[in-house]
Amino acid sequence: EYSFRKMGQDQLRLMTFLGFHRFHLIGHDRGARTAYRMALDATDRIKSLTLMDITPTHFLLDALKSEVARAYYHWFFLAQPSPFPETLIAADADYYFESCLLGWGGSRLEQFDQHALEAYRKTWRDPATIEAMCNDYRAALEYDFDMDECDLSRQLDLPALVMWGEGGAMDKSFDLPET
């Protein structure tokens, strides 16, 4: 299972194993969604919370805007039933993932460290990796939305910092201080 709750539980077990009962928690993008769920589920373990570049999953999906749908198309593509997205991606995994890299972070592949890029390519060519990526996004639509809906009225009682990129898809689409 790839729900943010399950991933958060895995991380809580790891922190316990490492000897940290309470800790500061920082997350970006998917990691921020996991951190948000961890803070809801285990508030007593979190000293402070920093979230970067997200809107809560329920809010994002419930108030979906065209700008976000275009920028985050992969949420809906990867969440389609198996083996649809896996088959399309596997047909040319380099093309798909390099397009993602160019759309999300760089303007040319030469801007990426070539050793890191080769490690990425080796990983994303693995059918099990592609399936896991799809399952992560399936969980957001199958489980995470409903979990967040159950917690809509909850407020966290801990120090928190929420940051986002000015001019990014979230900034353009939502009144982030109000979310």
What are these regions (language model features)?
Residues Y2-I26, R30-T179:
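Flexible "cap/lid" subdomain of the alpha/beta-hydrolase fold that forms the substrate-access gate
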